[in-house]
Structure formats: C-alpha cells, structure tokens
Amino acid sequence: MKTPIYLCLAHMGGGEQRYIQEAFDTNWVVPLGPNVNGFEEDLAEFLQQSSTRSLSTASTSLDSCTSKHTPHVCALSSGTSALHLAMVLLDIKAGDEVICQSFTFAASANPITYQGATPVFVDSEPDTWNMSPQLLQEAIEDRMAKTGKKPKAIVVVHLYGMPAKMKEIMEIATHYDIPIIEDAAEALGSTYDGQQCGTFGHFGVLSFNGNKMITTGGGGAIICPTTEAKQRALFFATQARENYPYYQHEHIGYNYRLSNISAGIGRGQMEVLPQHIAHHQHLAEIYAQAFASCPHITLHTNPNDAFSSNYWLNTILISPEAACTPDEIREMLAAQQIETRPLWKPMHLQPVFRNAPSYTNGVSQSLFERGLCLPSGPWVTANDAKLIADLIIQKVKKKYGCDFF
C-alpha cells in the first residue's frame, strides 16, 4: 500500500513537549502564562529579522538584519480572531466599507461583516496573484465618489506565502490615509524588500492552524505597531474586562486568548521555523526545475529579487492549451494517494458575498480555473516532489498523445 502524500501536515520539532510539560508541571494551563509571553517574544524577535534568500539559494540558512518596524505581538486563538480584533481596534462599524483582496480564503473577509461593515472586493494582478494596486486606487476613488467617504481600511493578503506589491499598495494607502491590515496568515517568514510580511501595515495577522508554517494546534497572532495597541488588543481578547475588583464591562469583548499549553507548542515550533521555511523553498526549487521544460505548466515563483516567498504552498497554473484540466490532474493524483487542492475561489464569486461591491479584471477567476496547489509541507520529501512533477508532466503528455517536450 502506498504511503499518502499530503498537502501540508504539521511537523513537530521535538521541543514542543518540553514546553507543554513545563505548563503542566507548573499548572499554567490557562490562556496566559510563561509560554504565552515567551511565544509572543519569540515571534517579535523573528519578525525583526529579514531574509534575502532567492529561489536559487533556498536551502541556506536565514540571514538576519534589523526590521524597519518594531513589532508588538499578541497571541490569539486564531488568525480570524486576529483579523477581527484589527477591525475592532480600527473602530470599523456598521456603515463603513473595507476594501479586501478578492483572491483569498473567506477568513480575510468574514470579520468585516462581524462589525456590520461592507466588504469591497478588489481583484489581483498576475505577478504575485495578490491585490492589484491599479484596481485598489480605482476602487478607493469610486467608493469615495459613490458614498461620500473613503473606505475605513484595506485588507491585503500575502497569498500562499507570496508577498503583495507592498511598495505600490503602501503608497496608495498613505496618499488616502487609509490603514492597512496585512493578512500574513500564510506568509510567516516571507519578505518583501527585506522586510517581514505582516510588519508593513497598521496591523498584521498570522495564523498557526495545523497546516501553516508553524502550528499551535490552532491559533493566531495580531502584530501591533505599539505597546499600547497590543494592550488594547489584549483587553478586547479577554472579554473587555475593566480594571475593577469586580467584573465590569463598558465595551463588548471576546474570548480570543491563546492557551499557555498551545503557546508551548508554538515555542517549540519557533525552534524549527527556519528549517520549515528552507524546506518549503527547497521544494519550490525542485518543482521549478522539474517543470522548466514543460511549456504548459507554470510554477508560481518570486516575480523579482524584492520578493522572497516562504512557498507555504507551491502552486501551478495549467495552460488552456494543455488540453488537460486541473481537475483531471487533481483526480489522477488523488488516485495515487497524493493530495492537491484547487486555488481559492475568489470572494466576489462566492454566493455569500454576491451583493458586495467588487472591482475585477478577470485575473483571480482565471487563476481559480487554471490553478492547483501541490504538496509542500515538511513531510514532503524531495523524491515526493519529483514524483508529483513527473506524474503531472506524464498526464499532460498522455492527454496530448505525443511527446512535445
């Protein structure tokens, strides 16, 4: 029986059990404690580093330098809760509009609706697959003309680990004085122009779900610009309890804190994060070499040296001329017990958001129709990646009925 190859499974480095055991030994099993504090400090230290690695040097160690921002990290129960708290801290409410990247997972957009606000979706550009700066500016101008006020925030996503075009996006946001929320849930360790993703915007968001670059079993973090903002996030994450000897509440709060046990997993994971990033990037190099001679399969790679993706998920596009659809490839690989996944269905095409304003150019819809996510996690070996690439290439060849490579 063949061993299944999964998309992206969690990988334990060994230190996790030590931190968990310390939590049990000291009875710190609540959503605060030494592991929570330590995990936040570990993340903040990492986010002040930068990586200058390119695809061709993917197996080398991380290079470090001082980040442009000093991050203040608050560990939370999920990436979604972090996005929600960013909305709360920006005082987003009913009647407001928030611009959101359309090509993303639903969690990027859902918290906008939690606040009673309206998402306004902006399509992608083809280089990074992330928010189009041109459409972003068009959307801002059009919403101001139609509503008489500017959008309250901009949610930019670094999809599949690929950094967005932050220089252009930040210039637009600064010009209109609109805060940016960076959804870096998939981009821990990715950098743009040497700066860690998640540290450009007013707030950044990370996810530690079981399939992310590191996991806490389920968790997330909000990256804040100041100590005061972090304390405000913590206040709302702990039911907005006021500083009284009894329980008094003057604001609506939430139960969004991360447990000390889960944070212990995170601390152990931080010890192997550089290796995880290097492994994902090394797999990208293998896929790139394998598909280089295949004219109808394109691996999504860094557009230029300013971009350094962690390649959380390696993704490919199948040319319409290939006469072989992504679904056919996915089904063929599934028969070999190899897990793949379609690219995200854009939010402006989701039934739940059918009435939301959107500014589109067809890019994200084309990506959705032509793309596929390939196994990329720490348990995927170099030989696995070579096998997967070979199976895909052979499928395309067989469909054509000739050897055109």
Could you tell me what each predicted segment is?
Residues 104-109:
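Conserved coil-to-alpha-helix start sites within the AMP-binding
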Residues 32-97, 111-113, 121-123, 146, ...:
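Phosphate-binding glycine-rich loop
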